Amino acid sequence: VKDNGSVALRTVLERCIIRIGGITKDSVKPNKWKELIQGMYINDQDYAFMKIRALSIGDTLTVTNKCPNPSCKKKIKTEFDIDEFDIIPYDGIEDIEFELPKGYYDKEGNKHTTGTIRRPVGLDREILDISARNNFGLANTLLLARCIKTLGDVKIHDSVIKDLSMKDRDYLLKLLAEHRCGYDIGEFDIECPECGEQFTVTLNNADFL
């Protein structure tokens, strides 16, 4: 489960969700239901999973971290209440418009700056989990290649994303983060009870499995 968290999460959702809008699980073929779950925004997948988790084992999440102080390294257990996480509402924007700070130049020297990008869905996460685990640079390249819908009249593929400036890539990743929705999980400040060291921990989906 820990080694393939995105697939494990999707499998739980496949089995536990019985209706999406007007579509019930029993009204479609299993492969179609799987596609529907994979096509959910990652934020929606996470929200649904948190609800299922709360119904199954309660609202409390316990996370263990090690104090970063070299002279301490105490294991610290921290409890989080799922109900206390803020929920960011969906803004209703399906295709997010953008204008790159620097722009992409094609082989003819034409500059392209405007386009649209979509939020990542469950299938994107599964592919990134398999293809780019522990390689954040590659993961970001694949993510943008899959999520950018238009960039001028350029056909989007991995090499286009690799040719973007770091400023443009950072801009697009920040844009996606700004348009996230669902549970606002992320970074939390923790103080070691043993030595008083203060540090920041980041929650991710694997912590909830």
Question: Whereabouts are the PLM-identified features?
Answer:
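Short, surface-exposed, charged amphipathic helix/loop patches that serve as local interaction elements
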Residues: 1-209
